[in-house]
């Protein structure tokens, strides 16, 4: 089964907690703090595996969690770091944040790796909190939480050439005749429901990869006829071979078919309207096709297109078509065209968040902020010294000032995620 999209959840490992301990040794009455640091949580890492060609594995496993770091030990011993979790994905996988729909990474290189979720830092042991005035720190920091995301994976095939056109115009037959690929072929619409890849060998060792894109229809850019799923794969190709049925047996006009498909490509992604095209007028073996072909070729050559009359069923004209494709590919950049505007460097940036937000809910001051979750997670709220450390962090970030400007009073309740505090000056 082919699968070109999936939704998964990833969670990096939490950092291990710092240790609270004091040096104990015979004849040493006042051993200092020697609590070790917690280990770092494991990262979640995507790795491109060229042996994969579908996202089907993510149909059965959707939740991925890396190993947490171990807690620190006595005698300044640090906890062991958690192991990274490696997730293998096919070449051409696009990773999106489900919440924002923002592209996080586009995996287009063999062996490419990407840390998609970073493990939490290990908490500091109490050895780090000794000062001249606090020689016996009775607290340590908890480990930071590992990053977690709900992700959308989309696979976009990578090929040199894409065969596009209406359903049942002969794209799969062409692929089967020019390569070793064995796509499903039948005389009805949407026989091909998944993209198929084939390698075309030209003499003297020259070759290129060609993809049979399932048939497109009017409204494909809006998802009609599974259009979104099919058009996704066209974006990766450097050259399009636009296959048109000139036999007239379907009762459609060949020029109108050509214009309709190009309109759908343009509406889906403006970049596709500028993608080079070679036109293959197929089914020339059917009576009446020759006359239709002459008018069709004349019109498209006026527009500057190269047009080849072929019959995929009899092999007529395929050799000439393939040589034209091979020669055209030589003139095109040897790079993968991405989803974004051509000739423009794509930089993915995480949206900047406000340091914190405060709102009042049923008389309770609710404070939210990504860094707050981390700081609170690393605080031992049952320890007075650790709480003091947390309060200083809030004051430094301006949270206390913001609360006072909102009119908070002594004894009012403050909630930070799942933890509530009474406000005191």
Swiss-Prot record:
Which keywords annotate this record?
A: Cytoplasm, GTP-binding, Hydrolase, Magnesium, Metal-binding, Nucleotide-binding
For this protein, the record's Gene3D superfamilies field holds: GTP-binding protein OBG, C-terminal domain (3.30.300.350), GTP1/OBG domain (2.70.210.12), P-loop containing nucleotide triphosphate hydrolases (3.40.50.300)
The cofactors it requires, by name, are: Mg(2+)
Chain residues that bind Mg(2+): 172, 192
Show the PROSITE patterns listed in the entry.
G_OBG (PS51710), GTP1_OBG (PS00905), OBG (PS51883), OCT (PS51881)
Q: Where in the cell is it found?
A: Cytoplasm
Principal location class: cytoplasm
EC code(s) of this entry: 3.6.5.-
Task: Give the GO terms filed under biological process for this record.
Answer: ribosome biogenesis
Ligand binding (GTP) = 165-172, 190-194, 212-215, 282-285, 311-313
Under the heading SUPFAM superfamilies, the entry gives: Obg GTP-binding protein C-terminal domain, Obg GTP-binding protein N-terminal domain, P-loop containing nucleoside triphosphate hydrolases
Q: Residue ranges of the OCT domain? A: 348-425
Pfam families recorded: DUF1967, GTP1_OBG, MMR_HSR1
* Gene Ontology molecular functions: GTP binding; GTPase activity; magnesium ion binding
Q: Which InterPro entries match?
A: G_OBG, GTP-bd, GTP-bd_Obg/CgtA, GTP-bd_prot_GTP1/OBG_C_sf, GTP1-OBG_CS, GTP1_OBG_dom, GTP1_OBG_dom_sf, OBG_GTPase
Function field: An essential GTPase which binds GTP, GDP and possibly (p)ppGpp with moderate affinity, with high nucleotide exchange rates and a fairly low GTP hydrolysis rate. Plays a role in control of the cell cycle, stress response, ribosome biogenesis and in those bacteria that undergo differentiation, in morphogenesis control.
Question: What family does the Swiss-Prot or TrEMBL record give for this protein?
Answer: Belongs to the TRAFAC class OBG-HflX-like GTPase superfamily. OBG GTPase family.
| Quaternary structure, from the entry | Monomer.
Q: What is this protein called?
A: GTPase Obg
Q: Which organism is it from?
A: Ruminiclostridium cellulolyticum (strain ATCC 35319 / DSM 5812 / JCM 6584 / H10) (Clostridium cellulolyticum)
């Amino acid at each position: 089964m082919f699968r070109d999209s999936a939704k998964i959840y990833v969670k990096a490992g939490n950092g291990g907690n710092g240790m609270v301990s004091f040096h104990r040794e015979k004849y040493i009455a006042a051993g200092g703090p020697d609590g070790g640091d917690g280990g770092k949580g494991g990262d979640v890492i995507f790795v491109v595996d060229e042996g994969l060609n579908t996202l089907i594995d993510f149909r059965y496993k959707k939740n991925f969690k890396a190993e947490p770091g171990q807690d620190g030990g006595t005698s300044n011993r640090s906890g062991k770091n958690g192991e990274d979790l490696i997730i293998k994905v096919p070449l051409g996988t696009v990773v999106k944040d489900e919440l924002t729909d923002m592209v996080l990474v586009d995996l287009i290189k063999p062996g490419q790796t990407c840390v998609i979720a970073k493990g939490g830092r290990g908490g500091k042991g109490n050895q780090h909190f000794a000062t001249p005035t606090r020689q016996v720190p009775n607290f340590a920091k908890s480990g930071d939480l590992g990053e977690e995301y709900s992700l959308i994976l989309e696979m976009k095939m990578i090929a040199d050439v894409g065969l596009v056109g209406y359903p049942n115009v002969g794209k799969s037959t062409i692929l089967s005749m020019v390569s070793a690929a064995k796509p499903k072929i039948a005389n009805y619409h949407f026989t091909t429901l998944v993209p198929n890849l084939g390698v075309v060998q030209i003499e003297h060792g020259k070759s290129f990869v060609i993809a049979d894109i399932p048939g497109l229809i009017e409204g494909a850019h809006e998802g009609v006829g599974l259009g979104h799923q099919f058009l996704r794969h066209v974006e990766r190709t450097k050259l399009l071979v636009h296959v048109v049925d000139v036999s007239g047996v379907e009762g459609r006009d060949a020029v109108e078919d050509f214009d309709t498909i190009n309109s759908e490509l343009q509406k889906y992604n403006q970049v596709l309207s500028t993608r080079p095209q070679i036109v293959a007028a197929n089914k020339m073996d059917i009576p009446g096709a020759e006359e239709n072909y002459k008018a069709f070729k004349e019109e498209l050559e006026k527009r500057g297109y190269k047009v080849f009359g072929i019959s995929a069923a009899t092999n007529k004209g395929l050799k000439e078509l393939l040589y034209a494709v091979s020669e055209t590919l030589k003139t095109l950049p040897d790079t993968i065209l991405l989803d974004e505007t051509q000739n423009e460097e794509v930089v993915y940036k995480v949206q900047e968040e406000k340091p914190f937000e405060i709102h009042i809910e049923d008389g309770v001051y609710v404070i939210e902020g990504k860094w707050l979750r981390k700081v609170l997670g690393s605080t031992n709220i049952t320890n007075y010294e650790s709480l003091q450390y947390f309060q200083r962090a809030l004051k430094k970030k301006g949270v206390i000032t913001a609360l006072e400007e909102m009119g908070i009073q002594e004894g009012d309740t403050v909630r930070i995620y799942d933890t509530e505090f009474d406000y005191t000056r």
